[in-house]
Amino acid sequence: TLENLEWRISEVRRLMISQDMDIRICRFRQEQALLSILPFCKLDKKLFEASKRNMLTSSAASCYPFTSFEMSDENGILLGVNQHNNSLVIVDIFNSRVYKNANMVLLGTSGAGKTFTLQLIALRMRRKSTQVFIIAPLKGHEFLRACNNIGGEFISISPASKQCINVCEIRKQDLSANQLIDGVVNENSILAKKIQQLHIFFSLLIPDINHEERQLLDEALIRTYAKKGITHNNESLIDPDHPDRYREMPLLGDVYEILMESPETKRMGNILNRLVNGSAKTFNQHTNVQLDNLYTVLDISELTGELLPVGMFVALDYVWDKAKEDRTKEKAIFIDEAWELIGDDDTSNPNNAKALAGEWVQEIFKIIRGYGGAAVAATQDIGDLDRSRFGKGILNVAKTKIILNLEEDEARRVQSILHLSDAEIMSITRFERGQGLISTNSNHITVSFKASPLEKQLITTDRMELNQILQEKMAQNAHNADL
């Protein structure tokens, strides 16, 4: 009816005005207006002149729910397929001409596929000869199949493991490439730098350590290395009998013996005793693993309670030393469930162990670019990341973010951080496993992550798919037995 038509016109006019848009009725030019909006390329010149306006490209981009429909770097790794145009999404985060840094953050709720996506990226980086380190604080067994298949090194850090990383070891680094580039040799005390790192380790082990004990611990550490002939003179590190390597390094047991000599340091020695003579004495050994492999997984999932942040520190310390060797080589450090190490950001409390560790992790994210590397963190604790100074710092220095499925309240937090549109947030809350949004360089693209059948078999955590793999292997073993 005419009344109904007039009501609809009124509603459309009211809606446009609410959006700060002007609306005019094409009186006596309805036919030209209809032909102009149809895909006939017959835009009426008079209507165009009456309605045209200048617009910034940023304003024009806001008319679209996603600001980019293409992401295909020349030498990148394949992540998946663009959901909007089925083009391949290929990203080279190490291309410094395109990306300010190679850091990446994966966000998603439990079961969204963070571990699957993280391993998929890590495997494809490895196939491009990028050195990959993965630190797994939870469910480390999920990384074992892929690691074994690609010929990687799987290192288990736990009280029950025979493998050990000596936290007191000063590792000899291959700095030949850096010296050729810079033409200078670093004369800073290597021992002083190592002791500084050990202070973080003991702060994690003894959260209530006070200022006096810190000073006494510092003296004990210097004495421990002095007994092995190591001083602040870097030349003292060289083994006289084997000039191509360093001297034998002290163990935690050597530190323990010195701490137990004095009543003022005996309390620290008693706490350290668990790692020397107690159930976790596996930490009191010389390093018996190698990090030369291009794909290294450090599993600390069997560490619980106060040993978990200690184990993460040991793993990060070892990997970080290796990552700084050659600035010309690509390398990536993956930290799954990074919040386990970052913790609180209250640095005003000197006894806050997680604050010290969080500051250290944030520093890695900030400066790893200078060593040709990337730091990748995966977490589902988005609220804590948003509230924490360290969490915000990591988000700010990660140029690339991958957002998997999120609950609506978590998605709204991400929206305020990454300035996503309502359409993008709606997509995030409806993502199925294997789908995500990549945000980088102001581009936002929805992607279906694609894995080959072999990759899926190596990294899947789905119960039904694991059961299918089990049945296939049992059938294969039965067939081999019959032969």
What name fits each language-model region?
Residues 1-50, 87-118, 122-123, 130, ...:
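Accessory regions of macromolecular translocation/handling assemblies
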Residues 379:
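H-loop/switch region of ABC-family ATPase nucleotide-binding domains
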Residues 161-169, 408-417:
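Conserved AAA+ ATPase core "coupling" helix
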Residues 105-116, 122-138, 142-156:
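Phosphate-binding active sites in nucleotide-utilizing proteins
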Residues 429-460, 467-469:
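Charged, low-complexity C-terminal accessory regions
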Residues 151-155, 390-403:
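A short helix-turn-beta junction within AAA+ P-loop NTPase domains corresponding to the substrate/partner-engaging
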